[in-house]
Amino acid sequence: MGSGSGWKGRDVISILDFDRDSLEQLFEVADKFSSLLRERGRIPLLEGYIVALAFFEPSTRTRLSFETAAKRLGADTIGFTSEEAISIAKGETLADTIRMLDSYADMIVLRHRYEGAALYAAEIAEHPVINAGDGKQHHPTQAMLDLYTVRKLFGTIDGLTYGVLGDLRYGRAASSFILALTIYRPRMIYLISPPLLRVRPEVRMVLDERGMRYREVESLEEVLGELDVLYVTRIQRERFPDQREYEKVRGSYRVTLELLEQHARRELRILHPLPRVDEIAPEVDGTPYAAYFEQARNGVPVRMALLALIAGREV
């Protein structure tokens, strides 16, 4: 469902489905919700709506921020947090589960381990489908809140030098963020990873097609001093087909305060989609470098804006 530049009734499958104007509209609405939430806890634009949260994979921040966003807007939520909790465990197909949810709810927020699951669901459902992460490449709403965070921190997304660090092969948040940057005009993108975890060919193809300046490197120290934004990701253990491969790359990078003080610009800001394991040392948390908790907080106003725009409700 839903196409064109307008938001009403639109599916959210890939960040590449959106242009700059659509994203700027989203960010302006998110700014309004950010201000309104400081004044009052509830803005009942979606009173009477039901939002289905269909999480076939575990999630903390994404699921809870969508649930909070829906409830702050006055909507009710239904859903589940794993396949084991529903009839999929008894052999029900994804298609039948989507049809059931579509008959109950006004929107479906879907997370699934298989790539293409959100697009498949959108083809079946009459109501809008929002991809909350599927497979290894797409996590569009995470990319939206990541861009929004950069915009709030720097006043712009253009003209900055970005480093994306860690699991660029299996990490869908990293892939989506890299793809999202191609909608803007970054000065430079450094893709920092071990050889086993280099960015996927289809992501590299988009970078090339859109004329992005980027470079693949293994050493963080080599480029850290140039960066305005460092986007750190954990190594995605659960997505490795071979655990021996995981053991080769686990702990490849660790961002410490000492490393930052030696190499980073004072203006550098660090993002992380969370959860983290040990890739950012806890002593970084209390420094101006750390923007990842603010980034997580931005999930609620951005997802409120998303739900309201798709419902066609004005702030």
From Swiss-Prot:
Specify which residues bind L-aspartate according to the UniProt entry for this protein.
90, 172, 234
Q: Which residues bind carbamoyl phosphate?
A: 61-62, 111, 139, 142, 274-275
The answer on whether this UniProt entry bears the keyword Magnesium reads no
Give UniProt keywords alphabetically. Pyrimidine biosynthesis, Transferase
Q: Enzyme group, top EC level?
A: transferase
One GO molecular-function annotation for this sequence? amino acid binding
Q: Which InterPro entries match?
A: Asp/Orn_carbamoyltranf_P-bd, Asp/Orn_carbamoylTrfase, Asp/Orn_carbamoylTrfase_sf, Asp_carbamoyltransf, Asp_carbamoyltransf_Asp/Orn-bd
Q: Which reaction does it catalyse?
A: carbamoyl phosphate + L-aspartate = N-carbamoyl-L-aspartate + phosphate + H(+)
Q: Which SUPFAM superfamilies does this entry report, sorted A to Z?
A: Aspartate/ornithine carbamoyltransferase (SSF53671)
EC? Answer: 2.1.3.2
The Gene Ontology biological process annotation of the record reads: 'de novo' pyrimidine nucleobase biosynthetic process; 'de novo' UMP biosynthetic process; amino acid metabolic process
Named in its record, the pathway it takes part in is: Pyrimidine metabolism; UMP biosynthesis via de novo pathway; (S)-dihydroorotate from bicarbonate: step 2/3
* PANTHER family registered for this protein in UniProt: ASPARTATE CARBAMOYLTRANSFERASE, ORNITHINE CARBAMOYLTRANSFERASE, MITOCHONDRIAL
Q: Which NCBIfam families match?
A: asp_carb_tr (TIGR00670), PRK00856.1 (NF002032)
The UniProt function text for this chain reads:
Catalyzes the condensation of carbamoyl phosphate and aspartate to form carbamoyl aspartate and inorganic phosphate, the committed step in the de novo pyrimidine nucleotide biosynthesis pathway.
Protein family according to the UniProt entry: Belongs to the aspartate/ornithine carbamoyltransferase superfamily. ATCase family.
Complex formation = Heterooligomer of catalytic and regulatory chains.
Name under which the protein is recorded: Aspartate carbamoyltransferase catalytic subunit
Q: Which organism is it from?
A: Hyperthermus butylicus (strain DSM 5456 / JCM 9403 / PLM1-5)
What gene does the UniProt entry assign to this protein? pyrB
